[in-house]
Amino acid sequence: GNSRVHNDDCEAFVYWFIEQAKAHGCETCIFLGDWHHHRASTNVSTMNYTVSNMERLGKAFEKVYVIMGNHDLFYRDKREINSMEFIRNIPNIHIVNDWIVEDDVAIIPWIVGDEWKKIEKMTQKYVFGHFELPYFKMNAMVEMPDVGGIKTEHFANCGMVFTGHFHKRQQMKNVTYMGN
């Protein structure tokens, strides 16, 4: 949200996260999408928190990949406008608005159109994204229905898949929703 309490909680998490990552020797950070919640009304205070925390992450890690989730996008069905463009020039920050596939790693933003059809051919060992997969719980009670698009089975040739989007931590086959 846009509240000071929410932003303070998120900032406290960033401090904790950096401390934990450093204790485990992590050099790269991959944020799995939806940094902002309100795609049409992110206020100036929230934007200031965003800049300070992205600068903090950029100093703590060699590379920070910020995946564009559906809430970071102005339109749900295209990625042409996002709420994170203003952090693009912070050192070590990489906004993921297009697919990145390098060697054993794929980093994929919110999928639009029929992009999901490319996933079945992928063989990457690690896939990071912001996926809306059926049969996972959207919250504690409600399961995502199958709407005829991307499915967990499409990742069968991949190793481990880590995704944002649903807020409940859960796992099915090789796909893990990290939750929040």
Where are the language model's segments positioned?
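Conserved beta-sheet core of the metallophosphoesterase superfamily
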Residues: 133, 139-180
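Core catalytic region of metal-dependent phosphoesterases/phosphodiesterases
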Residues: 2-100, 154-158
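A structural signal for the main folded, soluble domain(s) of proteins
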Residues: 14-16, 22, 113-115, 120, ...
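Short, solvent-exposed loop/turn segments at secondary-structure junctions
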Residues: 36, 72, 111-113, 132-134, ...
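Binuclear metal-dependent hydrolase catalytic cores centered on His/Asp/Glu-rich metal-binding motifs
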Residues: 99-153
